[in-house]
Amino acid sequence: MNAPVNPKKLIKGALGDWEVVIGMEIHAQVTSRSKLFSGASTAFGAEPNDNVSLVDAAMPGMLPVINRECVAQAVRTGLGLKAQINHRSVFDRKNYFYPDLPQGYQISQYKSPIVGEGEVLVDLPEGETIRVGIERLHLEQDAGKSLHDQHPSLSFVDLNRSGVALMEIVSKPDLRSAEEAKAYVTKLRTILRYLGTCDGDMEKGNLRADVNVSVRRPGEFLGTRCEIKNVNSIRFIGQAIEAEARRQIAILEDGGVIEQETRLFDPNKGETRSMRSKEEAHDYRYFPDPDLLPLEIDDAFIDELKTELPELPDTKKARFVAEYGLSAYDATVLVAERASADYFEAVARGRDGKAAANWVINELFGRLNKEGHGIEDSPVSAEQLGAIIDLIADGTISGKIAKDLFEIVWSEGGDPRAIVESRGLRQVTDTGAIEAAVDQIIAANPDKVVQAQAKPTLLGWFVGQTMKATGGKANPAAVNALLKAKLGIE
């Protein structure tokens, strides 16, 4: 049985409410130059079967040798997930036949994984924060790739991925909606990228998700789960969960029974389809790999890796709120990518943190999203954006001119201060010039003057006209003060 669920997360069926229960198995490719048990390269994009050693091809007599860096990356990830690091773990053979698995088994970890229980804090769009338990993290080999579209009657096998190190990160069934699942994968990917243990590139297959979905009436025992294999985008994860939950609800409300099975998500049809019956652990006949000794990790190794860990998203977010006075939402947006957080800090250094966050989130991120660029490709450097903020702060330019200046720097580059001088963008602070513009507008609009005196909110119209008359260069505070004095508005 379980605690009451948030009604907003329930799914409406024809015969009442249902709760969806979701667990995730994330396969994250370890960032390393060579494979888990061989010295073959892990470089992406090589010609088929170029990055294959005799070990990867399972040639007789070839023995696996553990890659120390892959072990270190798994431990770093465990530390980043606030998880237990197991001092002793065992590699097992997971036996099954598939053409792209040349050994006839996969080297994985079953009963004794390298990392035990941990947790991930996940911020949801509506402001709620949930804790998602991590059940385990284990190391295993990736399989090769079967290609069925190269020839009308033949299939081919590419073993470049065979033997590449994967971390399988298994969550507890703590997720209760498609949105929660998407937010969880997004946060997990952020942590991996901060740590440098996986690049999280789903398009290249470096991060893949198996999604376990079941439904139940609120408060009842867990239902029968189905596993949706190899979902390769966060958007598809959400769609797959919603489609599978609806399928199961329809079956149960029709009096049917859910069969435990493995399914695939078809994004074109927006539905899941049966792949095979779900295997149990005994189907794989796990047993310890006789070619590999148990993996033993001492405290000194773990402590050394701890000292090298970067500041992680949750800690960085808390610091941004405390140090720069940011809202929790703005801090969450800024720490979503390590490069974005670093960019913000470079802009905010020695400046007003809230102003820096406003410019980075609204102006820079808005333009980057519009152009389809990442922060690494920004044509406006942190130094340039900081200079624009300085020009506003010291009264050289107005906020409106600053946006025009941002566009110039984005399109043409250059030093913001030099651009202001060369293009005559300095704001007008000469009260005589501003007063002349104000007097002219008041004289030309006597009806508006009467209306503004009766309804002070119309002062904004006069401000706009004055800014227009001065090419946006008038100091807004000076314009406001003059207009209030001349119109007799307090």
From Swiss-Prot:
Enzyme Commission code: 6.3.5.-
Catalyzed reaction equations: L-glutamyl-tRNA(Gln) + L-glutamine + ATP + H2O = L-glutaminyl-tRNA(Gln) + L-glutamate + ADP + phosphate + H(+); L-aspartyl-tRNA(Asn) + L-glutamine + ATP + H2O = L-asparaginyl-tRNA(Asn) + L-glutamate + ADP + phosphate + 2 H(+)
Keywords: ATP-binding, Ligase, Nucleotide-binding, Protein biosynthesis
Keyword Nucleotide-binding included in the entry's annotation: yes
GO molecular function term, any single one: ATP binding
Pfam families to which the protein is assigned, alphabetical: GatB_N, GatB_Yqey
Top-level taxon of origin: Bacteria
Stored PROSITE patterns: GATB (PS01234)
UniProt cross-references to Gene3D superfamilies, sorted A to Z: 1.10.10.410, GatB domain, N-terminal subdomain (1.10.150.380)
InterPro entries (alphabetical): Asn/Gln-tRNA_amidoTrfase_suB/E, Asn/Gln-tRNA_Trfase_suB/E_cat, Asn/Gln_amidotransferase, Asn/Gln_tRNA_amidoTrase-B-like, GatB, GatB_C_1, GatB_Yqey_C_2, Gln-tRNA_amidoTrfase_suB_CS
Biological process, per Gene Ontology: glutaminyl-tRNAGln biosynthesis via transamidation; translation
Enzyme class: ligase
Assigned protein family: Belongs to the GatB/GatE family. GatB subfamily.
The protein's assembly and partners: Heterotrimer of A, B and C subunits.
Role description: Allows the formation of correctly charged Asn-tRNA(Asn) or Gln-tRNA(Gln) through the transamidation of misacylated Asp-tRNA(Asn) or Glu-tRNA(Gln) in organisms which lack either or both of asparaginyl-tRNA or glutaminyl-tRNA synthetases. The reaction takes place in the presence of glutamine and ATP through an activated phospho-Asp-tRNA(Asn) or phospho-Glu-tRNA(Gln).
Protein known as: Aspartyl/glutamyl-tRNA(Asn/Gln) amidotransferase subunit B
Organism, scientific name: Methylobacterium nodulans (strain LMG 21967 / CNCM I-2342 / ORS 2060)
